[in-house]
Amino acid sequence: MQFAKMHGLGNDFMVVDAVTQNVYFSPELIRRLADRHCGVGFDQLLVVEPPYDPELDFHYRIFNADGSEVAQCGNGARCFARFVRLKGLTNKRDIAVSTQTGRMVLSVTDDELVRVNMGEPNFEPQQVPFRAVKAEKTYIMRADEHTVLCGVVSMGNPHCVIQVEDVDTAKVETLGPLLESHERFPERANIGFMQVVDSHTVRLRVYERGAGETQACGSGACAAVAVGIQQGLLSANVRVSLPGGDLDIQWDGPGHPLFMTGPATHVYDGFIHL
């Protein structure tokens, strides 16, 4: 099986063309491939499939390193767009794809950055999903001896965003796994720790469900900005600084889609016998 290794700001992927290759990935195989000592090693596996709808270009599937399938990965979406162009699967600059939960348009810019229409953030608890009596801008959550205030949003996948004074000292490794699998998130969640520098700049670390802390999380950056704007902390255009680099997020508020712009890097092509 041929594959490519790619990354978006250090969030790394194994990308596989299932348009011209017949492939099947069991959870066990994915875990074996994800092993950084005995396999290829990656945060997520991205699979390019033929479109289910003739109006679209491709179907986009995402699997975490633990073998679970998820509906959204923003950094992966940028790599997906570069991959299909690099491999000659399309020469379009605006690429329409379906995901497990919806549709996206991926736009490759002249300088090879990728701008992704992530759709409109959804704050309705049942759509996240998140167990709450009603929608609020902030929720109180308790996990073991910890009590935190957070915002909750879906970017096609569930996110919990906590504002912190300093991301460098945030309790990512302690609170991350506790909140990721909290009973109020029936499908688990990605946990973002956001430091607001000013209305145009945030620093962010994300503990991703099924992957742990990663160098960057595109949908997590989108979620953090959406929550920050909802809470009146941020403007419509925000630079998000993650451990792996920066993303630019634009959201004009309710009724509008959110856009993420950032790089996608091809590292190498490989072949593996399954």
UniProtKB/Swiss-Prot annotation:
- Localization, UniProt: Cytoplasm
Residues of the signal peptide: none
Gene Ontology MF annotations? diaminopimelate epimerase activity
Residues at the site labelled Important for dimerization: Y268
Which Enzyme Commission numbers does its entry carry? Answer: 5.1.1.7
Q: Where does substrate bind?
A: N11, Q44, N64, G74, N75, N157, N190, E208, R209, G218, S219
Reactions mediated catalytically = (2S,6S)-2,6-diaminopimelate = meso-2,6-diaminopimelate
Q: Which residues form the active site?
A: C73, C217
Could be important to modulate the pK values of the two catalytic cysteine residues, annotated site positions: H159, E208
> What PANTHER family would the database entry show?
DIAMINOPIMELATE EPIMERASE, DIAMINOPIMELATE EPIMERASE, CHLOROPLASTIC
**NCBIfam families (UniProt xref):** DapF (TIGR00652)
Q: What does this protein do?
A: Catalyzes the stereoinversion of LL-2,6-diaminopimelate (L,L-DAP) to meso-diaminopimelate (meso-DAP), a precursor of L-lysine and an essential component of the bacterial peptidoglycan.
Which family does this protein fall into? Answer: Belongs to the diaminopimelate epimerase family.
This protein's name: Diaminopimelate epimerase
Whose protein is this, by species? Pectobacterium carotovorum subsp. carotovorum (strain PC1)
High-level lineage? Bacteria, Pseudomonadati, Pseudomonadota, Gammaproteobacteria, Enterobacterales
